[in-house]
């Protein structure tokens, strides 16, 4: 007799990529869960603004008051992100300090996973890539450069580390496209790319930006606006 079983887990991409891993082909349906989008965030924290936002159809200009409220919500989303625990806590308590603690705990749990699930010889390089992400994205062009990890570093030394982070769903790699034509993969340059985090709020936390910086728009929209905006679009 067959039974329908629902399972949840993390690092599945890493587990399935291991040599010798067995899998019941054709018997499993996958559902990948991502951080909440901006729309889902609005629905969770401000149902009134969410309703107004969903009524925008592009046929008429957005009222100035509504536009201002949406910009403020966007700034807050850049700092909060879409990790479910962070959004849920903020929706209930509106405490930014608690949100930042949750984000830091998530980042710490990622680091613990590195040591738990990676071969010992690869651990240092995974940490080097991970710890360099915010600095890579803070640059003007935000292109990933191995030399920014360590002087004299080469691609072949860090390819497996980047692959692991991507398979784990912690970062996403975006290759440069030489020509905007389909299929995009035919015009992709694998040696020119950017690495983004899976959640813009976690990136904001890695930048050590406070919620006040996000809401006031000072440091957020001068030093790191481009990086956070690009990560938001990707997300």
Language-model features and meaning:
Residues 2-7:
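Loop/turn-to-beta-strand initiation segments
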Residues 9-10, 15-138:
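Interdomain motor-coupling "hinge/lid" segment immediately C-terminal to the ATP-binding subdomain
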Residues 87-235:
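Accessory nucleic acid-recognition modules appended to NTPase machines
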């Amino acid at each position: 007799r067959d039974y329908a079983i629902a399972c949840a887990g993390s690092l599945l991409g890493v587990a399935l990529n291991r040599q010798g891993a067995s899998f019941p082909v054709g018997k499993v349906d996958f559902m990948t869960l991502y951080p909440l989008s901006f729309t889902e965030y609005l629905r969770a924290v401000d149902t009134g603004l969410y309703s107004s936002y969903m009524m925008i159809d592009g046929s008429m200009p957005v009222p100035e008051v509504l536009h201002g409220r949406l910009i403020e919500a966007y700034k807050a989303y850049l700092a909060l992100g879409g990790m479910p625990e962070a959004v849920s806590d903020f929706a209930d308590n509106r405490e930014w300090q608690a949100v930042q603690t949750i984000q830091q705990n998530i980042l710490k749990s990622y680091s613990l996973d590195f040591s738990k699930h990676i071969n010992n010889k690869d651990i240092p390089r995974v940490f080097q890539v991970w710890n360099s992400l915010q600095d890579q994205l803070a640059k003007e062009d935000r292109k990933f450069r191995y030399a920014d990890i360590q002087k004299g570093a080469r691609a072949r030394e860090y390819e497996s580390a980047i692959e692991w982070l991507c398979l784990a769903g912690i970062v996403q790699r975006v290759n440069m496209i030489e020509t905007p034509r389909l299929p995009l993969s035919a015009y992709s340059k694998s040696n020119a790319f950017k690495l983004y985090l899976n959640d813009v709020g976690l990136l904001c936390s890695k930048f050590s930006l406070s919620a006040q910086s996000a809401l006031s728009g000072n440091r957020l929209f001068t030093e790191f606006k481009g990086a956070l905006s690009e990560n938001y679009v990707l997300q």
